[in-house]
Amino acid sequence: MSNEVETSTTNGQPDQQAAPKAPSKKEKKKGSEKTDEYLLARFKGDGVKYKAKLIGIDDVPDARGDKMSQDSMMKLKGMAAAGRSQGQHKQRIWVNISLSGIKIIDEKTGVIEHEHPVNKISFIARDVTDNRAFGYVCGGEGQHQFFAIKTGQQAEPLVVDLKDLFQVIYNVKKKEEEKKKVEEANKAEENGSEALMTLDDQANKLKLGVDQMDLFGDMSTPPDLNNPTESRDILLVDLNSEIDTNQNSLRENPFLTNGVTSCSLPRPKPQASFLPESAFSANLNFFPTPNPDPFRDDPFAQPDQSAPSSFHSLTSADQKKANPGSLSTPQSKGPLNGDTDYFGQQFDQISNRTGKQEAQGGPWPYPSSQTQQAVRTQNGVSEKEQNGFHIKSSPNPFVGSPPKGLSVPNGVKQDLESSVQSSAHDSIAIIPPPQSTKPGRGRRTAKSSANDLLASDIFASEPPGQMSPTGQPAVPQANFMDLFKTSAPAPMGSGPLVGLGTVPVTPPQAGPWTPVVFTPSTTVVPGAIISGQPSGFGQPLVFGTTPAVQVWNQPSSFATAASPPPPAVWCPTTSVAPNTWSSTSPLGNPFQSSNIFPPSTISTQSFPQPMMSSVLVTPPQPPPRNGPLKDTLSDAFTGLDPLGDKEVKEVKEMFKDFQLRQPPLVPSRKGETPSSGTSSAFSSYFNNKVGIPQEHVDHDDFDANQLLNKINEPPKPAPRQGVLSGTKSADNSLENPFSKGFSSTNPSVVSQPASSDAHRSPFGNPFA
């Protein structure tokens, strides 16, 4: 295609050009050169055009140079490849070669982008690797530029034409100079000075010829820069091999392992110091000192004889004096898995200074190293090492723990008492007595957290005298909880739950019949809320938390916990689920307390006898059965404080005057049934239907104000007790509150009239 372009772009006389082309090919075969006439005719006018693409333009420092041109070509090809990845394309151009020089013309617009005369072109470089690329350097002094061009066809014809162009120009000038020389020779006799000028001109011509020989050069660049980093990778590999050689020579010299050129940690195998692990360890030694044992890197040496790790190089002199045994002992038998694992242990130690203080604040002080290493180990690794504490004493029996009061790098104060009492504490920790169960460990954990929170010294070891023989912490250990205590501690209190004072939270008991019951419900109205019962037991669960005791502000709910459970006949047919509030939602009538729980489910140990008698004397009819709840509540406080009815609801007060007139008339009617009189039935019905709903709803809602008022105020009587029936007289409130729970065997509520007479207290009613 270039040949077609050449013939079409030459100025006229194609017949004349065709004639010399044939002999030129023959002459090329013969090795003869092209004639000047042919070259002049070829580059005359517009010259020759070649279709190409402009790779790029780069500024270069020198006018010529193969290496410079190669570097510039590589740079421009890389930039072109980057632009191609972004969708950019090279500029399509025409390269015009003529006697005037080189012209770069835009293919689309035909505008001459660049024009360089022959005398401005200082160097032309061809690419021996990429046969479709070449470049040339042009510009004045200090303004040299390298133009990289990629031709559509082979670049060799274009470079040959450039050579021919320079050659023909040189020949033309030479001929002109010869003509001038002949003319000057004819005139030389006239002026001898002209002979000197002729010599100077000849010297310049020779110099021009020499420059023409240095005009062209060769460069080598890859044809395609799809992988431009190939040569760089080779250089990096060579450099890496050189580094390996240097490091091997350093590694073989044992006297250079002083903490600067190699890691100061004992290693199972030699490693190059430029690795990340050893480089990090070398950075730890900010003040390296010569190693007294240059052969300690021997992988076959015993780990006990290894030098101190680099972690101790960070330790100050005071800390080293404080713990003299830590530097002379092996650091957890050396790094078992190499430097990486040992660095992981060091980082664990740093993190455990703040993250794992629970073990430090525990009830056990730090024991001696022998028992600790011999017993408290897991998988051959000591417990302190697993927790990140590498400050272990030597297993040598002659090496003791550090002196008392001296600080350790972790800030732990190891008292002399801990080393003396170490064997006892270890025996307790490993073989705890039977009393030390999971609750005991829970208390120990609470104690340790307490020390972490409020102790002056988090890491201070606990004196042995404060430890109980059973392995549980003594009572004075929880003294910080006394800040919140407002009442005496419970006799069977456990932990900070009892020390909370007036907060009526029932601690869990180990007995099988006392589940946890939330007592604020009982403090509101002791008789209204019934403790939950498990289905497997026949006795009521109120024995664990007696509401009557809580009402009188006793700090512990275990005052009557030792009382024996009632017979199994007292087990109601309708049992409430454990730890549940009394709810009326699943019942048909929300005001029937008998549907919530039968009177037999109420603990007779928790309430006085008047309350229990009033519960048992309720009539069998469903409407009157609503009364036992309110009567139980009112009778309990009426017998204790007759004047305590100041805060009774208005609904109660509506019928208070009518109900208070009948109790004095009832004492002689103990044998009568409550259903015999219409007035008592009316009174009980009216009392249960009108007086209870408001109070019962209040108990279901658990008003916070009512809870606080009921806890702090004295007991109040409920004067409505006599309206139920003639048998429910005022003396019912004075019966023995404990006689019913121990002696009654009434299995049902139907026979309540007879059972109430049989179990009445022989004592009279002093308030009747």
From Swiss-Prot:
Pfam families membership: DAB2_SBM, PID
The organism's place on the tree of life at top rank: Eukaryota
Region (Required for interaction with MYO6): 649-768
CDD domains, alphabetized: PTB_Dab
Intervals of motif DPF 2: 298-300
Motif (DPF 1): 293-295
Localization, UniProt: Cytoplasm; Cytoplasmic vesicle, Clathrin-coated vesicle membrane; Membrane, Clathrin-coated pit
UniProt-listed InterPro entries: DAB1/2_SBM, Dab_PTB, PH-like_dom_sf, PTB/PI_dom
Quaternary structure (record): Can interact (via PID domain) with LDLR, APP, APLP1 and APLP2, and weakly with INPP5D (via NPXY motifs); the interaction is impaired by tyrosine phosphorylation of the respective NPXY motifs. Can weakly interact (via PID domain) with LRP1 (via NPXY motif); the interaction is enhanced by tyrosine phosphorylation of the NPXY motif. Interacts with LRP2 (via NPXY motif); the interaction is not affected by tyrosine phosphorylation of the NPXY motif. Interacts with clathrin; in vitro can assemble clathrin triskelia into polyhedral coats.
Protein name (database record): Disabled homolog 2
Protein's organism: Rattus norvegicus
Gene: Dab2
